[in-house]
Amino acid sequence: MEAQDAGLYYRGIDRIGWTDLVPRHELRKHGSSQDWSYMEGKSMDASVHYGSSKNEKFHGPHPHTLGQNRLLAALPEEVYERLAPDLEPVRLELGSVLHESGEHLRYIYFPVDSIVSLLCELDDGASGEIAVVGNEGLVGIALFMGGKSTLSRAVVQSAGFAFRIRADILVREFENGGALREVVLLYTQALITQTAQTAVCNRFHAVEQQLCRWLLMSLDRMPSNELTMTQELIANNLGVRREGVTEAAGKLQAAGLIHYCRGKIIVLDRPKLEQRACECYAVVEKEFYRLLSKRTLSTAR
């Protein structure tokens, strides 16, 4: 699949399943990715009992719904309703850590408009991103594979909201089989593909191509074309020197593809950004679509 073919699909969100990637020529039938008004997820009473100094418990009304996370949206109504009372909204701040490497996982997070990086760290302090999680997935996949912890570190790379649930509650639902197990296992396979492709990309492709891939994957998990991100954080995620990111971002800005200023990146020309990216972006997105499109979720409704 050619890199430019990644533009064939448009990402939106639908309450009933993973129907977010549709041919661009059908765009007018599905609304805009910037328009969230056609979603029908259920609002939650934002009362949270747990929190930390950086991931604060959130009190009062908020504009987010469970259906804005696509894994939750793919669940049948009875499962959705059963889990809803235990899903609590939390504000995830930029740079906050959801779990450290080897730490016992107490919660599972379903991002809504936040993005979380899964990082692998070396003894010398160097780190690299192995996967990125947004409103297409969840943080805490190791719990479903029988582990209580993972070697990766989960760090918020873009602030926003998520819904979280106690690990024991969701694992118990998973062990009962049915729709949740199907959705989680399909997502796990897609996440493995992303991790593998990221490793290949970081080994063989130029920094500019990696940056384009990373920006596109981040945008796909956001409701806007603007990212709040420092070049230092991007460099850490890609496992490259900051100077390399500065040079690559400068070329993209000079070409009119992005605008970067004071930690904010605005994508101005996504089609051209897709053309500059390597094939890794399209490979990962195609696999997510193949595994998690509405056609494959036979139990979703």
Segments the model singles out, each with a brief description of its role:
Residues 40-93, 138, 143-144:
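Cyclic nucleotide-binding regulatory module and flanking cytosolic helices
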Residues 96-158:
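Cyclic nucleotide-binding regulatory domains
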Residues 131-189, 193, 197:
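Cyclic-nucleotide recognition modules
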Residues 158-159, 174-241:
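Polybasic "coupling" helices that flank or enter modular domains
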Residues 217-301:
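Phosphate-/nucleic-acid-contacting segments
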